[in-house]
Amino acid sequence: MKQFYIVDSSMLPEVVGKVIAARALLQNGEVKQVSEAVKQVGISRGTYYKYKDYVFLPDPEMASRKAVISLMLHHDRGILSEVLTTMSQAQASIVTINQNIPIHNWASVVMSFDISALQGTLDDLVTKLGNIRGVSDVHLVSVE
């Protein structure tokens, strides 16, 4: 299995950043050929080919964290809206919502959301959601 490291760029040779810059020029369509890209950034083609498959910038999507909660909502007007408002106030960005039809006036809801900018803790959010009128059985299903 391959091992990966997160290393401060100041610890790496300058060519690593130039290889990433050359790849960006090619991917963005600013240049059409490798020879043009390496000339612009100031490295040799050999250096580019040596490192191109091994150095990458972190993916911004990887920095996001997701959580999934399940809860039961009473079938009354405005309860889901209040749940969403509470999530928004905590800076939780909703990714998916799945609500089943109400049975005996209770609907099961499962929500996934991005917590990378969450204000407060997940426990605080779960508690706030559980305190909303018409909301019960709030459970944190998973966090990634």
Curated annotation (Swiss-Prot):
NCBIfam families: PRK04435.1 (NF003361). It comes from Lacticaseibacillus casei (strain BL23). HAMAP family: UPF0735. InterPro entries: ACT-like_dom_sf, ACT_dom, UPF0735_ACT_dom-cont. This is UPF0735 ACT domain-containing protein LCABL_12100. SUPFAM superfamilies: ACT-like. CDD domains: ACT_PheB-BS. Belongs to the UPF0735 family. Residues 68-143 form the ACT domain.
